[in-house]
């Protein structure tokens, strides 16, 4: 029995190592390519002896990444904030009050999650044009918030059902606390793990969004990183050093965010999966 368990653990460890290598290799190639000086065509597997950071500064200027970074941070930050606030507020009564109406609303949210966003793109674009909101941060924030709200409510609901004791809420209610006070002073602080999970997931999705950005943010002044990077890649397809440097800079904020919140991210996923 013990030998079989040890063998299983070795197989799992080996598979985990293979998956880790599969994810690390593209990043390593990207890093070595970005650090090579112009004209250095040595193998992508060899780390450069003479490291050059000139590619980063040149890519930053030529791709106008500064403006794109600001636009993307505004859209991602406000969208994630709205998702956390309104998603948690919507999930709490759905998780705690299992009425027929709440069950129907929850089922509707789940069904929305399986609908591809592109199916509604044409009518949505016409509505945005009629409202005169094309090329504005507000429409990008609104659309991204609406797109990822069902997933946010789903994750919050599962976490609340599995980890927030009903007795804790009942005790606060007996003491005379109102619904909103109970939520913001007792429930919401306990949602830190799943909030970190939602923050990472939503930020990564919105940061990397291309389909909404290419439709609604066509003006260069409001372009996000994905749109700016797509244009930059097309113009510099033969200059892999610049392309690699630009790609590294674009992905860096999300890597930092994940490293900062990874402890809560894992806790949020595991806790929310314990109970339906």
From Swiss-Prot:
Induction: Repressed by the transcriptional regulator MelR. Induced by melibiose and raffinose.
Subcellular compartments: Cell membrane
Entries under InterPro entries matching the protein: MetI-like, MetI-like_sf
Record note on disruption phenotype: Deletion of the gene abolishes induction in the presence of melibiose and raffinose.
Keyword terms of this UniProt record: Cell membrane, Membrane, Polysaccharide transport, Sugar transport, Transmembrane, Transmembrane helix, Transport
Domain of life: Bacteria
Transmembrane segments: 11-31, 74-94, 104-124, 139-159, 186-206, 240-260
Membrane topology, from the record: Multi-pass membrane protein
Gene3D superfamilies from the UniProt entry: MetI-like
Pfam family of the protein (one): BPD_transp_1
Domain ABC transmembrane type-1 intervals: 69-261
Subunit structure as annotated in this protein's UniProt entry: The complex is composed of two ATP-binding proteins (MsmX), two transmembrane proteins (MelC and MelD) and a solute-binding protein (MelE).
Function: Part of the ABC transporter complex MelEDC-MsmX involved in melibiose, raffinose and stachyose import. Probably responsible for the translocation of the substrate across the membrane.
Family membership noted in the UniProt record: Belongs to the binding-protein-dependent transport system permease family.
Name the UniProt record assigns to this protein: Melibiose/raffinose/stachyose import permease protein MelC
Organism listed in the record: Bacillus subtilis (strain 168)
């Amino acid at each position: 029995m013990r030998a079989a368990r040890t063998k299983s653990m070795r197989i799992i460890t080996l598979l985990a190592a293979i998956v880790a290598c599969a994810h690390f290799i593209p990043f390593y190639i990207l890093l070595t390519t970005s650090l090579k000086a112009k004209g250095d065509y040595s193998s992508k597997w060899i780390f450069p002896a003479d490291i050059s950071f000139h590619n980063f500064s040149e890519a930053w200027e030529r791709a106008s990444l500064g403006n794109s970074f600001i636009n993307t941070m505004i859209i991602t930050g406000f969208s994630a904030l709205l998702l956390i606030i309104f998603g948690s507020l919507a999930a709490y009564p759905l998780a705690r009050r299992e009425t027929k109406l709440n069950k129907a609303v929850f089922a509707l949210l789940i069904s929305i999650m399986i609908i591809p966003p592109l199916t509604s793109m044409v009518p949505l674009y016409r509505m945005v044009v009629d409202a005169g909101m094309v090329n504005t941060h507000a429409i990008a924030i609104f659309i991204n918030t609406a797109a990822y709200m069902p997933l946010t409510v789903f994750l919050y609901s599962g976490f609340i059902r599995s980890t927030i004791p009903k007795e804790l809420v009942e005790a606060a209610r007996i003491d005379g606390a109102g619904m909103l006070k109970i939520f913001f002073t007792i429930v919401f602080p306990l949602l830190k793990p799943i909030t970190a999970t939602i923050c990472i997931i939503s930020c990564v999705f919105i940061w990397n969004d291309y389909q909404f950005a290419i439709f609604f943010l066509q003006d260069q002044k409001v372009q996000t990183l994905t749109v700016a990077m797509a244009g930059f890649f097309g113009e510099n397809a033969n200059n892999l050093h610049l392309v690699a440097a630009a790609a590294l800079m674009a992905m860096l904020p999300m890597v930092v965010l994940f490293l900062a919140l990874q402890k809560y991210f894992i806790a949020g996923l595991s806790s929310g999966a314990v109970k339906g």
